[in-house]
Regions:
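Accessory carbohydrate-binding/adhesion or oligomerization-edge regions at the termini
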Residues: 1-101, 183, 256, 532, ...
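Accessory beta-strand-rich segments of carbohydrate-active enzymes
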Residues: 2-21, 40, 44-45, 59-63, ...
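Active-site-adjacent substrate/metal-binding segments within catalytic domains
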Residues: 91-127, 133-139, 143-150, 156-159, ...
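Short glycine/proline/serine/threonine-rich loop/turn segments at secondary-structure transition edges
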Residues: 133, 173-177, 276-290
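Beta-strand-rich binding/interaction modules
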Residues: 148-150, 231-265, 271
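Exposed aromatic-hydrophobic patches
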Residues: 164-171, 270-278
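Extracellular recognition modules
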Residues: 181-183, 292-296
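Substrate-binding/catalytic cleft of secreted carbohydrate-active enzymes
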Residues: 357-359, 366-561
Length: 561
């Protein structure tokens, strides 16, 4: 089959998406509640009768230059290798591993990037016995950018490596055999926002999903909880795709096998619901009590599909300069967590579970998702096992501090990049907003600025006023902080002064959070006892996140050179 490959999108600024679906909450639909309830969170993605996981063996051809990519590309004659998806090019022999902290891999001239760059062509053949009424293709993680084609036709384009990229592919599918082609470029304009301290790798590194749904189906949902007195309310809305006529939406809150409450309402395009005076147990990292909330779409009384949310009831408030959860000051005994395994960026369910259970065994109670949103399964595990999460947007421009001059605000204060910033923050929020584990939103890391961050903060304050916003970079501006004061690697004397509210540079009446401290890559860390003596002496000091959870490494098979 022949494809005319787009060779412009990855370098066409300010473009960052074509034909992508709007951001929405992550969920895996099932055709009925009973089957979903009997499925664990680790298996949920892989056992749904409405979702096909396309991960596994794919055809793959690596080109070291875009100019070598045939035009048109004929997949019938293309010499493909076989590759496992998800995977990284650098861990499968196509490029050597490359680690860098601050710099870009090319001269820093935003938004310009090298143009004749490596590109990977992925192909997946799959069969459909019948066509559904709606079909959504989801890439949970691709770096750096992605053009999608199906059955010879162009579908769309995406940047934003760690945010979900979804496409409506119903018009392109057919009964029988289908061919999916994904073209991944090593760099894009978006690379300027992904200059994180890590191995710089490429490829489809998270799962690929195809959901096949009814003409009217669940498209998005939101759940919020609020404490009033000694009880909680739960409110939310369900967004439907398709015609809601003749449908109802049932919302059921379960505590194990016991029903807490249920209601069934007439479906609208946007269906609101509310529960009042719920006598429930609160969620915390120490006692992570969750309730299973099932949202079921019905037609003529029969289930069409269901989704599950692990609902935690907790209240976050800032009282003067003290951060509280459920009315009590808490300490974040945290770590910074990169996606890193012997497979590179690839972290399967077993890897995610191992990290979470190890954290709990070591008395870690918080994790900052440095420096991008994680696989959504990680957040579900944090809900269930009890970890406070600082959910961080996929924004870092650290290379502007190095090459060719020190100019940290170069991108963050440039209005032409604003929509790129807002898109990454908006998609993080929409995907992750229903997780009780999230106690702080983070606007990114080491991106200088403040102008584009201000707009992102305003957006989060508007849509989610109940969760505070953090961004360390603002400490070097006149704003000093958004909702919490954030610094990295502060001297212990400074931490003591802040805790005693006698800091030389007045930071305002806000809690103090060390987003990074006690640097522990390689040899380290030191001074933990001194830091924690200070943190425990003052309610203003929230604690912090050690840099970092695990060293980054490459598997070196025995005998390899």
């Amino acid at each position: 089959m022949k494809y005319v490959i787009n060779r412009e999108n990855y370098k066409k600024f300010p473009l960052f998406e074509v034909n992508k679906c709007e951001g929405r909450a992550y969920f895996i639909p099932y055709s009925n509640r009973e089957t979903l309830a009997a499925t664990s969170c680790l298996e949920e993605r892989y056992k749904s009768d409405l979702v096909t996981v396309l991960s596994g063996e794919w055809d793959f051809h690596y080109y070291d230059k875009v100019s070598k990519l045939p035009q048109p590309l004929d997949t019938d004659v293309e010499a493909f290798d076989r590759i496992q998806v998800p995977s990284d090019w650098q861990r499968t022999g196509y490029e050597p591993p490359f680690y860098v902290n601050q710099r870009y891999q090319f001269p820093c001239k935003p938004p310009k990037i090298p143009t004749d760059i490596p590109v990977g062509v992925y192909r997946k053949i799959f069969s459909l016995e019948t066509l559904s009424d709606q079909s959504i293709l989801t890439f949970l993680g691709v770096i750096s950018s992605l053009d999608v084609y199906i059955n010879g036709q162009y579908v769309g384009y995406s940047e934003g490596a760690h945010n979900s990229a979804e496409f409506d592919v119903q018009p392109f599918l057919r009964e029988g055999e289908n061919e999916l082609v994904a073209v991944v470029f090593k760099y894009s304009n978006g690379t300027y926002l992904e200059c994180q301290d890590m191995f710089r790798e490429n490829g489809i590194f998270r799962d690929v999903l195809l959901s096949r749904r009814a003409a009217t189906c669940l498209n998005d949902y939101q759940i919020k909880t609020k404490k009033t007195g000694n009880t909680y309310s739960l409110s939310g809305k369900v967004e439907l795709a398709g015609n809601p006529a003749g449908h109802t939406v049932q919302i059921t809150i379960m505590a194990g096998d016991s029903m807490v409450s249920t209601q069934e309402v007439t479906a609208q395009q946007s269906t609101a619901f509310s529960f009042q005076d719920l006598a429930v147990r609160e969620w915390s990292a120490e006692i992570p009590t969750v309730y299973e909330t099932y949202i079921t779409l019905k037609k003529d009384g029969q289930p069409v599909e269901s989704l599950r949310n692990y609902t935690g009831f907790r209240s976050i408030t800032i009282k003067k300069d003290v951060f509280t959860l459920n009315g009590k000051a808490i300490k974040l005994k945290g770590v910074n967590h990169h996606d890193t395994s012997l497979k590179g960026y690839v972290m399967d369910a077993e890897d995610l579970l191992r990290d979470v259970t190890l954290m709990k065994s070591l008395n870690v109670n918080a994790v900052r998702t440095s420096h991008y949103p994680p696989d959504p399964m990680f957040l579900t595990l944090c809900d269930l096992y009890g970890l406070y999460v600082v959910d961080e947007a996929d924004i870092e421009t650290h290379g502007t501090c190095c090459d060719p001059i020190y100019w940290p605000n170069r991108i963050s204060n440039h209005k032409k990049w604003l929509q790129h910033y807002l898109d990454r923050v908006r998609r993080m929020y929409l995907r992750d907003r229903n997780h009780p584990c999230i106690v702080l939103w983070s606007l990114g890391n080491e991106a200088g600025g403040w102008k584009n961050q201000d707009a992102c903060c305003e957006y989060l304050h508007h849509v989610c006023p109940e969760i505070p916003v953090h961004y360390e970079g603002v400490i070097r501006t006149r704003r000093l902080a958004y909702d919490v004061i954030s610094e990295m690697y502060p001297h212990i004397d400074h931490v003591r002064e802040v805790g005693e509210r006698r800091e030389k540079k007045k930071l305002g009446e806000k809690p103090f959070f060390m987003c990074e401290y006690a640097h522990a890559m390689g040899v380290g860390p030191g001074g933990l006892a001194e830091y924690w003596d200070a943190v425990l002496s003052s309610d203003r000091l929230m604690g912090g996140c050690i840099w970092e959870w695990a060293d980054h490494a490459v598997l070196n098979p025995e005998g390899a050179k």
